[in-house]
Amino acid sequence: MSRLQTRFAQLKQENRAALVTFVTAGDPDYASSLEILKGLPAAGADVIELGMPFTDPMADGPAIQLANIRALDGGQTLARTLQMVREFRSGESETPLVLMGYFNPIHHYGVERFIAEAKEVGVDGLIVVDLPPEHNEDLCHPAQAAGLDFIRLTTPTTGDQRLPTVLEGSSGFVYYVSVAGVTGANAATLEHVEEAVARLRRHTDLPIGIGFGIRSAEHAAAVARLADGVVVGSALIDRIAKARDNAQAVKDVLALCGELAEGVRNAR
């Protein structure tokens, strides 16, 4: 079993959802970003999504766009992001880590090289937001052949006819974007989330993670009662943007992660 399968199976036994945290590699700088990454499991993150900075993150809202700019201004590259995972893995072998981003940097790096190095440094899966299933052979199939999970995004506008196509070849978990729009947008109603989870469960046995718009422990707990995973990104990244310095940013992100984890763990 993959690290993702193992983690979700273990949490199912515990009858609770996973807290899935998203941060951007290299934000606010390499050292602070690595410190955040290393601190997330102890703060309560069950799965980590690590953003690969890109100059044109079109699916992301202002918070993550600014995080991309901060990281790129600090010299973050895809090679440095893979190195960051290697350093994280030197002390943490159980928490699943998924790289999330866009196809362009991977394409420029070289797909075969990227997959080989991602596997070697301890990446567990990929979320590539601008690569539809019609392009599975570009990355999804070779990644899975190498033992990396490929996690698909579904949205409120993904209809029942389209869902089987989107889910075909998905592995790890399904990431349901509960609001059609950019990351960090307003949250969906819980009724909408409940209906969406029920609809997805008719099409897949994979765990379902819900993201976009979750900002507080209370909201995380409410979503954790309905889904297998609660994904939080913009709220954590806002803490970095608002911190007076990088040391404070590390503390504030890990503190919020702890609050969210408590909400998720006490939800059911």
Swiss-Prot record:
The keyword Amino-acid biosynthesis applies. Tetramer of two alpha and two beta chains. The alpha subunit is responsible for the aldol cleavage of indoleglycerol phosphate to indole and glyceraldehyde 3-phosphate. The gene is trpA. This is Tryptophan synthase alpha chain. It comes from Pseudomonas aeruginosa (strain LESB58). Pathway: Amino-acid biosynthesis; L-tryptophan biosynthesis; L-tryptophan from chorismate: step 5/5. PANTHER family: TRYPTOPHAN SYNTHASE ALPHA CHAIN, CHLOROPLASTIC, TRYPTOPHAN SYNTHASE, ALPHA CHAIN. It catalyses: (1S,2R)-1-C-(indol-3-yl)glycerol 3-phosphate + L-serine = D-glyceraldehyde 3-phosphate + L-tryptophan + H2O.
